[in-house]
Amino acid sequence: MNIVVLGPGAVGSLWALHLHSAGHQVALWSRQAQPTITLQLDEEAPISFRNQNLDTLIHADLLLITVKAWQVEAALQPLLPHLNRETILLFMHNGMGAVEAISESLTHFPVLFATTTHGALKATLNQVSHTGFGQTQVGPFNALGARCDFIADVFNHALAPVTWNPEIQQALWRKLAVNCAINPLTAIHQCANGALVAPEFTPIITAILDEVTAVMQAEAISGEAEALRDGVYQVIQATAANLSSMHQDVFHRRPTEIDFITGYVVRKGEQHGIATPVNSALYQQIKTLEQSWSKA
């Protein structure tokens, strides 16, 4: 397949390299304006990819979108007029709501979501480390996307295991619950994920997930608070030494994805008349931090 990766950060670069190794024609669309970008995965041989090449966009069978949620609209909208209407759009990012916000622009395209537990890190612009093996689920956002289940096989051949999940919203909400519990707390307290096992965090994690569960159920997504809590603590223990993406964003004073994580739950709660005081307070704390940097 002809594949373009929009936003080759750590995860996007990981997939670009594995899809290239699986025999696909892969190009990048990065903020960097140079015509080629070289990436190296761990100790493997470096690979050069075409970058910001309009011809690769016009002939793309698949556009893999791995920018951060708050970057989706600005990064994708200028590219849409150059895409064939049969080009599959596959979104792989933290949080929810970014695709909904631009859904009217996407009605003619097959649209897919993916969620992955692979860990990746870019120490430099060109060096990619695969820091943790995981699994990936792919599923449809719209009816055209529902016809594209073969993409799971394409990705599975590149970096297994990958499964097709026709109920991808369930998986996205479960990951959102994990992010709602871990990201704002680790960002505010500037701690590693593992610190959240401390007893003083138990009440707030419980309250966060109770609110998320209520909103999920109003959205007709099945979920039990206890099961979500078990999932959160599994992730905390499995990633104990890790610094969450929001922790890093706050540390480096970068925009966070709070609007598409905690903010998404708060907005959906408002739509359904469900109070989310704990998530709302965390949302405001992160937004206040972001605003303080812009004034500094």
From Swiss-Prot:
One of its GO terms (cellular component) is cytoplasm. Pathway: Cofactor biosynthesis; (R)-pantothenate biosynthesis; (R)-pantoate from 3-methyl-2-oxobutanoate: step 2/2. It is found in: Cytoplasm. Pfam families: ApbA (PF02558), ApbA_C (PF08546). The keyword Cytoplasm applies. SUPFAM superfamilies: 6-phosphogluconate dehydrogenase C-terminal domain-like (SSF48179), NAD(P)-binding Rossmann-fold domains (SSF51735). GO terms for biological process: pantothenate biosynthetic process. InterPro entries: 6-PGluconate_DH-like_C_sf (IPR008927), 6PGD_dom2 (IPR013328), ApbA (IPR003710), Ketopantoate_reductase (IPR050838), KPA_reductase (IPR013752), KPR_N (IPR013332), NAD(P)-bd_dom_sf (IPR036291). It comes from the Bacteria. The keyword Plastid does not apply. The active site is at residue 175. Substrate binds at residues 94, 179, 183, 193, 245. One of its GO terms (molecular function) is 2-dehydropantoate 2-reductase activity. It catalyses: (R)-pantoate + NADP(+) = 2-dehydropantoate + NADPH + H(+). Its EC number is 1.1.1.169. NADP(+) binds at residues 7-12, 94, 120, 257. Keywords: Cytoplasm, NADP, Oxidoreductase, Pantothenate biosynthesis. Belongs to the ketopantoate reductase family. Catalyzes the NADPH-dependent reduction of ketopantoate into pantoic acid. This is 2-dehydropantoate 2-reductase. It comes from Vibrio cholerae serotype O1 (strain ATCC 39315 / El Tor Inaba N16961). The lineage of its organism: Bacteria, Pseudomonadati, Pseudomonadota, Gammaproteobacteria, Vibrionales.
